Amino acid sequence: MKEENKKAKACRKDWKNEPMPEKHETFVLQRSFNEKQMDLLRAGHIPEVMEDKWFFYVEGETLFAHRSWTGYCIYRIDFKEDDHHIVRVNRDPEQYGCTDIKEDIVNLNKLLDYWTRDPYDHYEEWLDEIQDGLKKAGKE
């Protein structure tokens, strides 16, 4: 790939972001990533349009995932070599409504599936989120 076609790596200063609140929960995410997937995650993502709901970046071996509109940190993933990654998830009810670890594991895995695609399609991810919301509301 030509150098000029490579996206700049996302970093903390690229977008509005808040720290993980004191009110959070921790769980272990068992998942392996190949080198290409880790490279995509390390590159991060800077939102480009309103429907692009996530800003994420990696510092060291930690991924920080923030909602693009509010800057709230929803997930923090500390990557581990044994594929037992430590995840902190926001539990501040004013910032994030989910309170169920099982639901967070499903949601985070879906996000990671999208974020490790090349190229990442924020629009497809947005549609999937809308569909999940309708299912939860019993509207589908």
Model-derived segments and spans:
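Canonical SH2 domain fold
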Residues: L63-E81
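Polybasic, proline/glycine-rich intrinsically disordered low-complexity segments
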Residues: D83-E140
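Short, flexible loop/turn elements at secondary-structure junctions
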Residues: G60, R67-W69, R91-P93
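Negatively charged, low-complexity tracts enriched in Asp/Glu with abundant Ser/Thr
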Residues: K2-T62
